Amino acid sequence: MSRYGLQKLYINGAYTDSTSGDTFDAVNPANGECIAQLQAANAQDVDKAVAAAKQGQPVWAAMTAMERSRILRRAVDILRDRNDELAAIETADTGKPLSETRSVDIVTGADVLEYYAGLIPALEGQQIPLRGSAFVYTRREPLGVVAGIGAWNYPLQIALWKSAPALAAGNAMIFKPSEVTSLTALKLAGIYTEAGLPAGVFNVLTGSGDQVGQMLTEHPGIAKVSFTGGIASGKKVMANAAGSTLKDVTMELGGKSPLIIFADADLDKAADIAMMANFYSSGQVCTNGTRVFVPLALQAAFEQKIVERVKRIHIGDPSDERTNFGPLVSFQHRDSVMRYIDSGKREGATLLIGGYSLTEGALAHGAYVAPTVFTHCRDDMQIVREEIFGPVMSILSYQSEEEVIRRANDTEYGLAAGVVTQDLNRAHRVIHQLQAGICWINTWGESAPEMPVGGYKHSGVGRENGISTLEHYTQIKSIQVELSSFNSVF
C-alpha cells in the first residue's frame, strides 16, 4: 500500500469513485517512490461534476455576501491549522523542500483566499442617472460554472488562486490539477466542504490534460476556463473554449523573463536577487528571471559572486528542513532540463558551474539537476530563447541602456521583468519600457494577493489576483428604470 493510498475524485461534496476505475500513480521525485494511486476521470465523470456544480451554484450564489465570506474565512482557518500536514504532502508530491512548502505554498494560498473572502461584501453594481425620470443600475452576477486547470509547480497555491475569486463571486468551480501533482487539490476540496461550502460548488477531477482538461474546455456547461501551463497547451485550451461555447478564458502561460542589473547596483544584492530569481523551487517558477543582463564591465565580478552563492546551496532530501534545493518535479522533466543544458554546451555558452544531473549517494534515485549557470550567452541560443523551467541561469552582457531594453523585449514572452539599480528615475524609466505584466524593482518574486499577476504577448491573457480578477468572474447586467410615462412612435 502506498503512503497516501487510493485517491478518489471529489464530486458533489464527497470523495467519489471514478466511472472507469482507471488509476495512475503519484511519484515522489526525490526517490521514485509511488506515494498514491489516483483515479482518472472520464467524460461521464465530467458530466457528473458539471451537473453537481449546476445544482450547487445557485444555492451558493443565493447566500448573502457575509455568509459566503464567513465560509471562505473558515476555510482559511482550516488551511492554516493544517499547514504542516499539507506542506508535507506537497513536498512528497512535488519534491519541493519542506522549508518552502511550510512557509510559502499553503501560507500564500490561504492569504489569497482570505483576501477574496474580505472582498465579497464589496462586490457591487452602479447607479447611473439618465434624466429626472430615468436611471440605470447594474448588477454583477456570477458566470455560473467555471473550470480551473492547474500547473504542477504550485499545486495548492494555484488551486486557491483560481478557486478563491471564482467562489467569492458566487460561481461553482470544477478544478483539474496537474496529473503530476494532484494530492493537495483533493485535500482542499474536503476543506471547503468542512468549512460549509454547499455540495457541488467545488469539485476536483484528476486525470490527464489531454483528456479531462479538453473535456472541460469543450463542455457546454462551463462558462469560463482559467488555465496555467505552457504556450502550446494554452493556445489549444483557448481555441477549444472559443470553438465550443465562446467561453471566457484566463491564461498564464509562462515566461523567459529578463533581470537587468545596472552598473550602480549593489552587486551583492543583485547576486542575491538573481539567485532567488533562478534557483528558488529548483528553478520551477514561471516568473523566473532566467535572462540575467549584466554590464560588460561588471560581468566577471558578478559571475564570481554567483558561483560563490551556488556553492552554498544545500541540495538534499526535501523532507530535511536544512535542504533549500530539491529535485525537479519528475524524471521526465529532469530529462527535458538536461537536454537544454546539453544544448547550451553545444551552442557555445560558457558553463560556469553545474550542468549535470545528480546521480550519486542519497540523491541517486531522485530527479535532481545541479544548479547550473551559463555565461557569454547569445540572444539566439536555445537556452536564452525558450522556457526551460529548471535551475538554469543565463548571463548576458550589455553596454547601454537602450541596448538592454531592446534585447530584454526581444522575446515572444512577456510575463515578468526586473531591474536592480539605486537610481529610481532610471528604474521607472526602464520598467515602463519593458514588455512584461509583472515587474520588480530591487526585488524579485513576491506576488501579494492584491497584485494582479499575468503576462503580455504569449505569456497570457487576463490576470489572477487583485480586485479586477474578482470582477472578471462576474457578468454585468444593466437595468434601465423609467419612472414616468412611456411614449411610443406607433
Curated annotation (Swiss-Prot):
- Reactions mediated catalytically: betaine aldehyde + NAD(+) + H2O = glycine betaine + NADH + 2 H(+)
UniProt binding sites for K(+) 2: L246, K457, G460
Catalytic-site annotation from UniProt: K162, E252, C286, E464
Q: Name one Pfam family in it.
A: Aldedh
Named from the GO MF annotations, one term is: betaine-aldehyde dehydrogenase (NAD+) activity
**Highest taxon above the source species:** Bacteria
Pathways involved: Amine and polyamine biosynthesis; betaine biosynthesis via choline pathway; betaine from betaine aldehyde: step 1/1
Cysteine sulfenic acid (-SOH) PTM positions? C286
Q: Under which main EC class is this enzyme filed?
A: oxidoreductase
**PROSITE patterns xrefs:** ALDEHYDE_DEHYDR_CYS (PS00070), ALDEHYDE_DEHYDR_GLU (PS00687)
Q: Name one GO biological process term.
A: glycine betaine biosynthetic process from choline
Q: Where is this site: Seems to be a necessary countercharge to the potassium cations?
A: D248
| PANTHER family recorded | ALDEHYDE DEHYDROGENASE-RELATED
The similarity annotation says:
Belongs to the aldehyde dehydrogenase family.
Q: What is this protein called?
A: Betaine aldehyde dehydrogenase
Q: Which organism is it from?
A: Yersinia pseudotuberculosis serotype I (strain IP32953)
